[in-house]
């Protein structure tokens, strides 16, 4: 008799995705981040659900409802900080996952990659709206500044901003709709992640060498289930350490002050995971140009597969491309640092140079270097 897991309509889907899935025998720990992102999403949905039970999306009570969660609800402080720092862990895993894809040429699976880019946008939108909900100073002013960027769109800009606000400024209507969207988007993200996996399993996983691994496959379970569990344990260790020892390390002190439309904070800045894009935004003096650069800094990922000029898929055997990849990583870290600094000399010029280097590396330098490497190998 055939095993039930191979015949049952529901179990055979799970079986073909997580148990009997043929996987390359040489995938490294860099391939763990997909499962870690799944775990992060589950943590965020569960903690978010419990927070939503006690939160009120009204400008008069939002801030005090968050205070109430931390002070009066059983383990409310733990749920709140798991949710806030869980977002940081989510983005760390996301950036490492995307970095892995760029390094090993995983972007050659076009459908999987493009759904991944869509997922990145969805997660960023969700995180932005979630940051507005506690209704602290940085929540309010962050929402005001970022939504105001849409006014740079010619002709329809100002109408669009008022439509998103639900009035003439960020107010009760804005907070209520942001809460509604923040609640629904994670479920859309989960559905998109399912499609992401569906397309990945159509082609099979890439591997560090970038070569076809059909001749050497191993079952996903037990090899990679055990490997993923180790990754999950390390993730939970990092998250709980952060939550229990320094929960406010990655937050902004200004968000412990209730939102006040009459008092602007000295430095308006988003959470750390948006700082690189924020630095690119204010590196361009023109408003519309800045908004375009901000969107393109993420959207450029969708163009990467078409800029692949190398005869090899992975960077594993391409030392020049490897150097450029790590320069790109250093550049993004520089942009993240600049994004958190005040908008003044010398930070403006450093940000402008780092922004130019970011786009140049991806669009020009890396494709040309790949051609050069092909010629070196007489390909």
Swiss-Prot record:
Spans through the membrane: 33-53, 77-98, 113-133, 178-198, 226-246, 288-308, 320-340, 347-367
Localization in the cell: Mitochondrion inner membrane
InterPro entries linked to this entry: Cyt_b/b6_C, Cyt_b/b6_C_sf, Cyt_b/b6_N, Cytb/b6-like_sf, Cytochrome_b, Cytochrome_b_C_euk/bac, Cytochrome_b_N_euk/bac, Di-haem_cyt_TM
Residues at which heme b b562 binds: 83, 182
Biological source species: Sorex coronatus (Crowned shrew)
Official protein name in the record: Cytochrome b
CDD domains with a match to the protein in the record: cytochrome_b_C, Cytochrome_b_N
Highest taxon of the lineage: Eukaryota
GO annotation (BP), single: mitochondrial electron transport, ubiquinol to cytochrome c
């Amino acid at each position: 008799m055939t095993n039930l897991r191979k015949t049952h309509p529901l179990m055979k889907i799970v079986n073909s995705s997580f148990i009997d899935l043929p996987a390359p025998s040489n995938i490294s720990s860099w391939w763990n981040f997909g499962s870690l992102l799944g775990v992060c999403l589950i943590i965020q949905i569960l903690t978010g659900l419990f927070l939503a039970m006690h939160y009120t999306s009204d400008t008069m009570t939002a801030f005090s409802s968050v205070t109430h969660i931390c002070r009066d609800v059983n383990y409310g402080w733990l749920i709140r900080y798991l949710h806030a720092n869980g977002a940081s862990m989510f983005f760390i895993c996301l950036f490492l996952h995307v970095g892995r894809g760029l390094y090993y040429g995983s972007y050659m699976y076009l459908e999987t990659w493009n759904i991944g880019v869509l997922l990145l946008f969805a997660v960023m939108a969700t995180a932005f709206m979630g940051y507005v909900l506690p209704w602290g100073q940085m929540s309010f002013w962050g929402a005001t500044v970022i939504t105001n960027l849409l006014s740079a769109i010619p002709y329809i800009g100002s109408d669009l901003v008022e439509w998103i606000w639900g009035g003439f400024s960020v107010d009760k209507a804005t907070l209520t709709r942001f809460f509604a969207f923040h609640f629904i988007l994670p479920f859309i993200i989960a559905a998109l992640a399912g499609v992401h996996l569906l397309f990945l399993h159509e082609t099979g996983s890439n591997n560090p060498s970038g070569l076809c691994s059909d001749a050497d496959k191993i079952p996903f379970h037990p090899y990679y289930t055990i490997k993923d569990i180790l990754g999950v344990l390390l993730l939970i260790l990092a998250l709980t350490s952060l939550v229990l020892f320094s929960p406010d390390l990655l937050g902004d002190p200004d968000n412990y002050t209730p939102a006040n439309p009459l008092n602007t904070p000295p430095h308006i800045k988003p959470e750390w995971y948006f700082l690189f894009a924020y630095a690119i935004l204010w590196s361009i003096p023109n408003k519309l140009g800045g908004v375009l650069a901000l969107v393109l800094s993420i959207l450029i990922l969708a163009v990467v597969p078409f800029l692949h000029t190398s005869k090899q898929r992975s960077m594993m055997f391409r030392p020049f491309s490897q150097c450029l990849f790590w320069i790109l990583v250093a550049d993004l870290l520089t942009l993240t640092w600049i994004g958190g600094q005040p908008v003044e000399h010398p930070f403006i010029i450093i940000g402008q140079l780092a922004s130019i280097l970011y786009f140049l590396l991806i669009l020009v330098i890396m494709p040309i270097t790949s051609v050069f490497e092909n010629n070196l190998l007489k390909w």
